[in-house]
């Protein structure tokens, strides 16, 4: 007897396509504030397997972008901190360990609250900013390089001081409120209350200078709010919250076709899919949300998305054990001198892994046949840590493919999410951005969803509560971070 040729049909209020941080965060926030039935689809066997699981886990609060000509990306990071504290800290009380603290009497700024089970590690990123006597500037024959490094330094000091120093009180009417773009850009002071360093940082810079046969040069050291974050833990907690609010997940499912209604305003009627068992499935919903990076290109025309996608590859070098216990980034005007070191800690059963992730600002277009060159990362690491210390450890390298959107109006790299919808349609597209911006993209997508779908808004419980069965299910759904997968396979 022939097997039956049959297609399962399923209907829910909202379908979210994409199991990275954006899709999971949107599903979680929507489920927390509504009684809508929500289903999330992911083509991979687990959630968080692509860019969301491969990055170094850098929580960006603006430091890396504080020296750019345009302050918009810096402000996006600062606003992300506001959204995190207002929307997640009160709900995930035991997990989201960033909150306002009283730096001086009645003056509040954001800070990491030490918590071994928290999302954010209590280890700041120290920003190393070179000056005119640094190797990359003193070896240059261009006078403009010395001018440029000073301009960048002034931007960095001023912007970070306004955001996180002694210029802005974040507590306004019992809510967290970030400084405005105008506040940041209008500040002209050069003093910084954030200047700080450690002996480890100073020794590393001394060793770096020495590798160029130079005497110790002058640096501005800044203790930033940036830190390393536990990306897989964040995903697991968000998924646990989703499950507790009735969200269903289907992994290993592939979308074959979007069935569009093109008579009048374009609307999406169904998704025609293949399940991981190879069965046909038709999925229908009141609203479809696409929060997909890799593999989304074939659907751009059908959905009439205006932004273009571009994939780029960057390299990571993993070292075990960790090289030092301090996070730092060298922020130069010369790309080849960019370098960052992050220390991460993970536990697997009774085993504890403390490892370093090394990276720089290098990336290659995904259409290039050549892999990303990791030699510049290794060369910089040799200068900071020494060959013996570096190569006596277990070393691995891997590539991370990042899908980013490029606005057709302005051909440059973007780091924020792009949310696109049509008020007459029934779908929403969220194009990729930084993991750190997940609170903002979840909230902004929610605001857009309210214009497309009528539903009763709910006030969420005072705080997140889980149970063991849901946590076990969430652990199965979310992939381990890529570095941990490397350790487990070697």
Q: What do these predicted regions represent?
A:
Residues 12-39:
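N-terminal Rossmann-like FAD-binding beta1-loop-alpha1 element of flavoenzymes
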Residues 25-29, 43, 59, 94-96, ...:
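Active-site substrate-recognition segment that forms the wall
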